[in-house]
């Protein structure tokens, strides 16, 4: 059986470094990543992709996306399935190395946003936003928010949240239920 080289990339195409559970502050819900976690023991996508076929992601599979992948996406509970499919397409097109390098860049920007603009109620909101937005959009949002670093946290957080929502509307993204 192959060991995943990219433990922070789900077989399904999920970018673990942008997942709300990866950034959770609760030890009960925190996940170390799809390739490192005990979750993979029950993940049928992991079993099929890595254990049975020795693939790094489903992007390597000729029948992807398959029903197993869709069933897995329904179980997760975050609005991420469309992004998984987009990610698998990008991995197939550009290679996992290039795709994951961008994910790490997004992660660094996410961690900066969580450090300066997070009011303890928006972690999932930030993670999903950074998962869906293109890197240039994220850089633009974070750069614009930098000017407010000296403001009170609640004001910074509200302003950043509004900017992110506005950007989502401009890109016709419906990421959140609200």
Locate each region found by the language model.
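Cysteine-centered metal-binding/redox modules
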Residues: 1-178
């Amino acid at each position: 059986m192959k060991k995943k080289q990219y433990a922070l990339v789900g077989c399904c195409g999920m970018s673990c470094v942008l997942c709300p559970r990866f950034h959770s502050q609760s030890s009960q819900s925190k996940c170390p990543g799809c390739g490192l976690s005990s979750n993979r023991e029950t993940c049928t996508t992991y079993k099929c992709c890595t254990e049975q076929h020795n693939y790094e992601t489903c992007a390597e599979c000729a029948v992807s996306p398959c029903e197993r992948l869709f069933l897995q996406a329904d179980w997760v509970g975050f609005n991420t399935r469309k992004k998984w499919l987009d990610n698998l397409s990008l991995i197939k097109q550009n290679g996992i190395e290039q795709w994951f390098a961008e994910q790490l860049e997004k992660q660094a920007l996410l961690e900066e946003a969580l450090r300066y603009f997070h009011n303890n109620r928006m972690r999932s909101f930030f993670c999903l936003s950074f998962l869906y937005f293109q890197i240039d959009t994220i850089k633009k949002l974070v750069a614009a928010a930098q000017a407010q670093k000296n403001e009170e946290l609640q004001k910074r957080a509200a302003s950043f949240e509004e900017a992110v929502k506005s950007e989502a509307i401009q890109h016709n993204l419906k990421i959140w239920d609200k």
